[in-house]
């Protein structure tokens, strides 16, 4: 309707929300700034934004160094007694579970989780790896590393794997891009990690998973390589 009226008047439409008008942040603004995932996005956004506009208390716990607009929210720390006075708490985290003491405090609260997409995964694997094995191995790997699968932003491998069905299928399952790197690109950083003459002989570089995670994250590797019966994963984190 706003666009329709602006067309009649030959003017530029300005669409505002209640949080804009009240000079406050909003759940959707926070999620957008983090490229974040929220389950039941629309319903959660409408509910939380309505509370913010009506000056009701909504807690915000930031698990990490994420920089977001916190206006209108009650920013909490894990040792904060304010948690007890909150009915609803928005949590920003790329982890599956938080510290045990914090979980206890949040036990009876309604939790709205924003999962920033800041995790990248380097993958090496044997040719013709089964798709289910690849998917199940990654799910298990992320669970053991306490990483939320919704935090994955991108996966990558060496260019000889560009047609590897298991990795292509994984990117579709995760709904994230699959980026490939040439041996020349990988060789610029593979000296930083464990070397395998067998890998060098077969694909032209000394290793794949760690250098690819390094390249995807601009050098911010957070989990070294882990092997799963013909598959190797490594994790990097990008700065948002």
Show the residue positions of the predicted features:
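Conserved mixed alpha/beta catalytic, RNA-binding, or beta-rich assembly cores of soluble enzyme
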Residues: 1-37, 48-162, 166, 236-238
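Solvent-exposed, flexible loop/coil residues
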Residues: 34, 38, 190-193
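Long lumenal/extracellular ectodomains of secretory and single-pass membrane proteins
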Residues: 41-45
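C-terminal non-catalytic interaction/assembly regions of soluble proteins
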Residues: 133-140, 150-213, 217-233, 240
């Amino acid at each position: 309707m706003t666009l329709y009226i602006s067309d009649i008047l030959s003017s530029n439409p300005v669409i505002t929300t209640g949080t804009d008008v009240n000079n406050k942040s909003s759940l959707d603004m926070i999620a957008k700034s983090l490229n974040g995932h929220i389950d039941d996005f629309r319903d959660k956004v409408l509910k939380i934004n309505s509370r913010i506009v009506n000056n009701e208390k909504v807690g915000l716990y930031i698990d990490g160094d994420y920089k977001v607009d916190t206006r209108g929210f009650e920013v909490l720390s894990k040792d904060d007694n304010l948690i007890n006075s909150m009915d609803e708490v928005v949590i920003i985290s790329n982890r599956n579970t938080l510290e045990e003491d914090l979980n206890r405090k949040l036990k009876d609260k309604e939790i709205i989780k924003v999962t920033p997409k800041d995790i990248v995964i380097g993958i090496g694997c044997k040719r013709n790896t089964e798709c289910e094995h690849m998917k199940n191995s990654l799910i298990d790997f992320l669970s053991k590393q306490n990483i939320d699968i919704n935090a994955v932003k991108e996966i990558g491998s060496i260019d000889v794997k560009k047609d590897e069905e298991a990795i292509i299928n994984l990117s579709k399952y995760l709904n994230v891009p699959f980026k490939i790197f040439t041996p020349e690109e990988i060789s610029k950083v593979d000296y930083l990690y464990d070397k395998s003459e067998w890998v060098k002989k077969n694909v032209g570089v000394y290793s794949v998973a760690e250098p690819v995670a390094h390249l995807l994250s601009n050098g911010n590797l957070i989990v070294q390589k882990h092997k799963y019966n013909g598959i190797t994963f490594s994790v990097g984190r990008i700065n948002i």
